[in-house]
Amino acid sequence: MPILAKRVLFIDAEAMIIDKPAGLPVTSVRDGSLSLENYLASLCFGFKRWPSIVHRLDRDTSGCLLLARNPKMHRRLSEAFSQGQVKKCYWAILEGVPEKNEGIIDLPLLKISSPKSGWRIVADDKGKRAVTHWEILAKNKGRSLVAFRPETGRTHQLRVHAATGLGLPIVGDPFYGSHKDENISRMMLHAHSLEIARLEKKPITAEAPLPKAFTDLGF
């Protein structure tokens, strides 16, 4: 059982941000694994009502995850996400180094599915608008640590934009990666920071420290 109460990065009467560990699903999954939903009772901190999940991170993605502490705030925060009012920054280790130091990926994304392979996201002009700003933070042994700041919030956006837009998949990505490495324990995608402005109050904001899996690869 992950001790999530010790992974709180921000908390006040309205919201909290936790550092979600990689491998923990946000909501229930078909394989029966425990998810964040199973641990919400441990995050009440004196409130009778459990906090509610405002947005999702992929199971293998770690880092900043926002929870609301009352229904009214949940509606406001959900609206902020849907209207693109949330500042998000993700850090990822890529299989290679981009030719430029920074740039913008403007690549529409479409969800496709088949009985044999299931569903996945692909770059397609018929898809929904998806825009990501990126910049290189560090390089090491043929790989790069890249900061991604998405303008939009499409499913698997950063994973597909890295693999297709930059031609460099995220290390450890089981769906969009080019090869498997037995020495890689997880997908190297981390929700580094999150910020939401509030009227007449300080912003809801936090930064999640770089996981050990990243530092083990020299970053």
From Swiss-Prot:
Q: Which residues form the active site?
A: D58
Q: Which UniProt keywords apply?
A: Isomerase
Q: List where this protein forms a coiled coil.
A: none
Q: Which GO terms describe its biological process?
A: enzyme-directed rRNA pseudouridine synthesis
Write down the InterPro entries for this protein, in alphabetical order. PsdUridine_synth_cat_dom_sf (IPR020103), PsdUridine_synth_RluA-like_CS (IPR006224), PsdUridine_synth_RsuA/RluA (IPR006145), RluA_PseudoU_synthase (IPR050188)
Disulfide linkages recorded for this protein, renumbered to the chain, are none
Q: Which GO terms describe its molecular function?
A: catalytic activity, acting on RNA; pseudouridine synthase activity; RNA binding
Enzyme Commission number(s) of this protein: 5.4.99.-
Its domain of life reads Bacteria
What reaction does this enzyme carry out catalytically? Answer: a uridine in RNA = a pseudouridine in RNA
* Keyword Isomerase set for record: yes
What family does this belong to?
A: Belongs to the pseudouridine synthase RluA family.
Would you tell me the protein name for this molecule?
Uncharacterized RNA pseudouridine synthase ZMO0505
